[in-house]
Design a protein with these regions (language model features):
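Flavin (primarily FAD) cofactor-binding/catalytic cores of flavoenzymes
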Residues: 2-94, 152-278, 282-535
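Conserved N-terminal glycine-rich FAD pyrophosphate-binding loop of Rossmann-like flavoproteins
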Residues: 92-128, 309-329
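Flavin (FAD/FMN) cofactor-binding and adjacent substrate-gating region
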Residues: 110-152, 337-350
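Short, solvent-exposed coil/turn linker segments
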Residues: 83, 91, 105, 110-114, ...
């Protein structure tokens, strides 16, 4: 079988000898799929792929994931002047904020509501000015947003942007930089070193878009931004769901569960909440809002495994507020991790010392918003909201069709049965990186290792340690790198800081321009006027 394919010029000297290795018309008898030899090869060659009948596409820089991390990286590169034919986004989603939009929606953040992000943390705007607050003030023709930012957090809660504002601005910037032109649809199977330098990224294209089952992207640089490895369930709830095949009464906050709220609108019921982070706060707000709006008789029992009763921390300069089980903090981490003393300190630490500092400043937390405090206080006073500390030893079906949680008190050791109609697991998205196929393959075949928190170990410029190959580099950003030299990786601003570090490293390697003061100023005016980036 003969496959036609076009070979693009690879810049930076990479692949200069390819004309002798791979002809313009590649002939082979392979099926176009991965062979046992390729599956087990830590280093691939053009001849191996040709033998398997897998076509090769040359693009110097590919980013894997297509979500917010990929978008921010592409934004930096386009602003730096990298043309569209030098970048490809390998993804199975339609637009960069698709996954984030889904997760915020199912975790009870509607369009008009506000997300947990700082005013100047704009993934669509690498300069952070104008801020979200200034944009919303202009849009609403009201200075109230600016006044709010001025008096936060002493006299008002932290100002945060509307969900709809974030997505609208992302759509604007995506169109401006020509993001859609860069997308190659499909599922990435693996990234392997290439003999001679660089990498092969094996993509399974969407059905009907390729003559072969697999396509290989030959690149000097690969950027991995795949987000969370998977959805994490509490073990006892996972066991219940699998044993009884009951996915109606025990649900995760990050999966569609609108039926819970609709059922409670039609009859009184009891809901058990598990978890103490921002998602638990959002789910509680939805339950409280519905109870008030529709005059419902919903009862809520909130079970905390770790129960915070007041201020806590190792010393006076590293303490956060807490009460009634909750640990309170405006954002995921103290703000100095994005540009202060904690950021500088973490960059110097290695191994256990770094891991110990993560433990000190990490942990589940949520903002202390006034509306939530009032709702919970009203619930406790009205005896329809109850918080408790305990360890759930097992979950079983209830006699009336609901579920029973057997809870062992952490204080007294006694056990009680709590009957409810639903259990909502709000414990988060974390999962081991080995559960993600691409990340697991990196650990097995490409030399990647784990950091003190068990995630991917990356350099300060986000190159994955142990994966360098010739003049090529393999980068990773976002949640899979938590535990590295920069703590705030899984945030809008964190993704921007990571993208800037990667872009600066690419400039040091001579692959793209560095965004200096003059170029930055010119490009900001282009952003402000929504001028498309040419090429």
């Amino acid at each position: 079988m003969t496959e036609e394919w076009s070979r693009k010029t690879v810049i930076g000297g990479f692949g200069a000898d390819l004309a002798e290795i791979v002809p313009d018309k590649m002939s082979g008898e392979g099926s176009g799929d991965l062979t046992p030899e390729l599956l087990e090869a830590p280093v691939m060659t053009e001849a191996m792929l040709a033998s398997a009948g897998i076509p090769i596409i040359d693009v110097p820089f590919v980013t894997i994931g297509g979500g917010m991390g990929s978008f921010v990286m592409v934004d930096y590169l386009r602003i730096a002047g990298v043309p569209t034919d030098q970048i490809r986004v390998l993804t199975n989603i339609d637009f960069p904020w698709q996954t984030y939009e889904y997760l915020t929606r199912v975790s009870q953040i509607p369009d008009h509501s506000r997300i947990r992000s700082d005013s100047s943390s704009r993934p669509d705007n690498i300069w952070g000015f104008p801020s979200y607050a200034l944009s919303e003030a202009w849009q609403d023709k009201s200075p109230a947003h600016l006044w709010h930012v001025l008096i936060e957090p002493l006299f008002a809660d932290y100002w945060t942007p509307r969900r709809s504002t974030v997505f609208a601005s992302l759509g604007r910037e995506s169109k401006r930089i020509g993001y859609d032109k860069l997308i190659a649809r499909g599922a990435v199977r693996m990234v392997r070193r290439r003999s001679g330098g660089g990498y092969f990224t094996i993509l399974t294209p969407d059905a009907g878009t390729s003559a072969t089952k697999r396509v290989a992207y030959r690149s000097r640089f690969v950027h991995i931004a795949v987000g969370y490895p998977g959805l994490r369930y509490l073990p006892d709830l996972q066991e219940f769901r699998e044993k009884y095949q009951d996915y109606e009464h025990v649900v995760a906050a990050y999966e569609p569960h609108e039926h819970v709220y609709e059922t409670l609108k039609n009859r009184p019921g009891t809901v058990v909440i598990r978890g103490g982070g921002i998602v638990a706060s959002r789910v509680l707000q939805r339950l409280f809002d519905d109870r008030e709006k529709y005059q419902l008789q919903t009862n809520i029992i909130h079970i905390f495994r770790t129960y915070i009763e007041g201020k806590h921390g190792p010393h006076a300069w590293m303490r956060r507020k807490g009460s009634h089980g909750w640990a309170y903090q405006g954002f995921n981490y103290p703000k100095s991790v994005w540009g202060g003393q904690l950021k500088a300190r973490m960059r110097k630490l290695e191994g256990d010392a770094r891991g110990n500092l993560y433990k000190l400043m990490g942990g589940t937390n949520t903002p202390r918003r006034r509306v939530w405090q009032k709702q919970m206080a009203d619930g406790r006073a009205g005896d329809y909201y109850r918080d408790m500390q305990g360890e759930v030893t097992s979950v079983e079906p209830g006699a009336a069709g609901g579920v029973v949680s057997n809870v062992k008190s952490r204080k007294t050791g006694t056990e009680q049965r709590i009957e409810s109609d639903f259990i909502i697991d709000c414990t988060g998205l974390e999962a081991d990186i080995s559960e993600h196929r691409v990340l697991n393959d990196l650990l097995k075949y490409t030399g990647a290792g784990r950091n003190p928190l068990g995630r991917l170990e990356v350099e300060r410029h986000f190159e994955i340690k142990g994966t360098a190959n010739g003049d090529g580099a393999l980068y990773a950003v976002g949640a899979p790198t938590l535990g590295g030299y920069f703590p705030g990786v899984d945030t809008f601003l964190g993704l921007q800081i990571a993208a800037q570090e990667v872009a600066d490293d690419l400039a040091r390697r001579g692959w793209c321009r560095k965004i200096g003061p003059v170029r930055s100023t010119i490009q900001w005016f282009k952003w402000l006027t929504n001028t498309p980036i040419d090429r």
